[in-house]
Amino acid sequence: MWKLLANVVSNVVSQGWEVFVEVFVVSYRHIPSHTLSVPTDITVDKLNMLANKTLNNISDKEFESVAFDFLISSTILRTTLEEFVQENHVPVESVISIECIVQEPAPEPDSDIALLDWIGAIRCNDKFIASATYGGELVLWNHYGKKLTSSVLHEEAIKCLALLPDQKEDRIVTGGHDQVLMLSDVETHGSSTFIKPTCVLRGHERSVEAIAVNTDGTRTVSGGFDKMLKVWNTDKDDTSTVFEKTRSEKTGKKKRTDIITKIPMVTLSGHKDAIVSAVWSPNSAKEVLTVSWDHTISIWDLELAGQINTLAAKKAFTSISVCCSSGMLITGSVDPVVRLWDPRSHEGTLVKQSFIGHCGWISSVFWNKVKENLFISASFDKTVKMWDVRSNKTPLYDLVGHSDRILCCDWSVNELIVSGGVDCTMKTYRRKM
């Protein structure tokens, strides 16, 4: 992918603004720079037409029309050039650099699948989509909406799930209102797929609301309404945290069962209200971040078995996601605002940006795993929005279709966005890559 850069020189004259645009392509040095004069009230659409026309004229090769976004000082241009200059207090005598980047492809509605109950959690990998319902059922689908298999794993609503990264096999951990976590294998025999529960993780005293797993799937953390963060050994070969099996009353022998019970490695306290979302830090294998209804983000060191930092907010949190490359955080709260945090910052406010666009509580946020500028947010306003961190006032796209509150979303696969909620439907949106 190549980038187009433009230098805009502005001078105030008696009749208004005279703006000169110098266009050149970084990746194609043989294309000479080209200077144009444009009006200051030029819009993004007209700037797109001008950029494409200019590139077509100055390129010695056949040029295919491209839709661009335009960056000024790391902010995507969404207004006229004049409005941007005035709003951002850009000196009109200065040289303004405009970077033209290829627009992200729009997600198109793909699958619309009805289930029997609310969808409380959803996750996706390169093989399947996993959706969990308030009826306690885990359902697996292929990327095109075909049902692969299902299994009722919990006695009450499933509130969270995570896919354990494992090169040999697929495993899923679910947490529910029944206070337990269930670890299951996904087995494939020929064209058939099965969900096989292998471990039940017991220790929480109230509903389990949050799950996160480390990069190799050997450790899992969970949190819930008991305010506790629990650490579990989910290594396939672990026997150290296996709880003693119950014995048969009649024979005095251990029951024959494929499902074992595990207890937590450690239980950590610190939050004053429910833990509702958790992520493993990409910067340290021993750090976990949690958000709570107590208005705080907690950073935990699992080796030290305690909190090492706490970030305070004015609202109760609902969701957190972390950028794999930068370590930046996005959070959802009980208001319509998505917030961007830099937990490593020691200067000024830790909230670096607020993203305005929703009109209901933010229920779920998810960072794109390929591009560090992109993320999605789901809301009680029935929409999923796709954002670029360089445009905090206008989302790139609105993904519509849900008829009631959205409870969960996922963007683990770059070309596929999935969501589910109170309308008992799972929706997928596909991007052409």
UniProtKB/Swiss-Prot annotation:
UniProt GO cellular component terms: nucleoplasm; PeBoW complex; preribosome, large subunit precursor
Subcellular location, record wording: Nucleus, Nucleolus; Nucleus, Nucleoplasm
PROSITE patterns, A to Z: WD_REPEATS_1, WD_REPEATS_2, WD_REPEATS_REGION
WD repeat ranges, renumbered to this chain: 114-151, 153-194, 203-242, 270-310, 312-351, 357-397, 401-433
Chief place where the protein resides: nucleus
InterPro entries according to UniProt: G-protein_beta_WD-40_rep, NLE, WD40/YVTN_repeat-like_dom_sf, WD40_repeat_CS, WD40_repeat_dom_sf, WD40_rpt, WDR12/Ytm1
Entry keyword set: Nucleus, Repeat, Ribosome biogenesis, rRNA processing, WD repeat
Region called Ubiquitin-like (UBL) domain, residue ranges: 21-102
MF terms (GO), sorted A to Z: ribonucleoprotein complex binding
UniProt keyword annotation of RNA-binding present: no
GO biological process: maturation of 5.8S rRNA from tricistronic rRNA transcript (SSU-rRNA, 5.8S rRNA, LSU-rRNA); maturation of LSU-rRNA from tricistronic rRNA transcript (SSU-rRNA, 5.8S rRNA, LSU-rRNA)
Alphabetized Pfam families for the sequence: NLE (PF08154), WD40 (PF00400)
SUPFAM superfamilies, alphabetized: WD40 repeat-like
Domain of life: Eukaryota
Function according to Swiss-Prot or TrEMBL: Required for maturation of ribosomal RNAs and formation of the large ribosomal subunit.
Family as reported in the entry's similarity comment: Belongs to the WD repeat WDR12/YTM1 family.
Designated name of the protein: Ribosome biogenesis protein WDR12 homolog
Species for this entry: Brugia malayi
